[in-house]
Amino acid sequence: MSETEPTATTRAAAHPAPPAWNQWAEKRDASVSGSHGALALVATHWLGEGAAVALDGLPGRWAVDGDRVSLTAEPADALLVEGVAVDGVRLLDPDLAPDPTVVFHDGRKLVPIVREGVLAVRVYDPEAENRRTFAGIERFPYEPGLVFTARYEPYVHGHVEQVLNADGRERGLALDGDLVFGRDEVEYRLAATRTGDRFDVTFGDTTNGPDTFGFRQLAAAIVRPGSGEIVLDFNRAQLPPCAFSDHFICPVPPVGNRLDLAVTAGEKRRGVHA
């Protein structure tokens, strides 16, 4: 390295991170490492049609009942919904329902979920090994040169693209349009899912593998309602949930969202104590 080549430390000193970014980073660490955060996920039990079944490590019997999960238990099982032990049959609304149901058992949080019409029960355990070994999220120093103003080009008709998920299965990913930005006179496009003024992107770049997890996620928003101005701040690129637990089923980037660009900003990987 030459005497004039900047190191990560000198770059960080030259471009101190805004307080809001530091606060965001602290909140991210706290969120994933919470007692029932992403690091605590120890199982996802998929449910098939048919008779109620026992799930590994859990009391009670579990089944599919239409678009809800049916739980059969007795008070001695100590499966609590809103602080009250389930006694008999209780129907549980999954995570995407307007009022999802959460079950607690011996400190663990049990969350019914639904993906493409298939129901499952997720188990979050505060004693998970991933929580015990967590050493913080590794991040690049803040880089103001990786903050872009983008324009949104909606598709004439939004579509669902079949993409590989972290568990090896393909599932549909709804895409509504492209976020378009430029760097060094090169135009880049990222297919995004739009919800109101928010745009969610799953992307890859040339740092994946050597320096970062296999892909990352980014949320962008319209700066001012009605302006159409969108800020893509790659300093807030974050690891997908499956970087913290193998039991998440995150979609990988859709075709076209692998950038021929080194995005040396944002989260890199999960830190682990030796």
Predicted feature descriptions by range:
Residues M1-P19, Q23-E26, H273-A274:
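Actinobacteria-biased recognition of intrinsically disordered, low-complexity terminal regions
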Residues K27, V32-V53, G57:
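Extracellular/luminal recognition modules and glycoprotein regions
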Residues L47-P94, P225:
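Forkhead-associated
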Residues P59-D67, R108-V114, Y188-A192:
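Broad, structure-driven detector of short, well-ordered beta-strand segments within folded domains
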Residues A78, V84-V111, G117, R132:
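Phosphate/adenylate-binding glycine loop and adjacent helical scaffold
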Residues D106-L175, G182:
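Surface-exposed beta-loop interaction hotspot
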Residues V180-G226, N235:
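Acidic/His-leaning functional-site neighborhoods
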Residues E229, N235-A274:
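Extended, aromatic/histidine-rich regions of cofactor-dependent oxidoreductases associated
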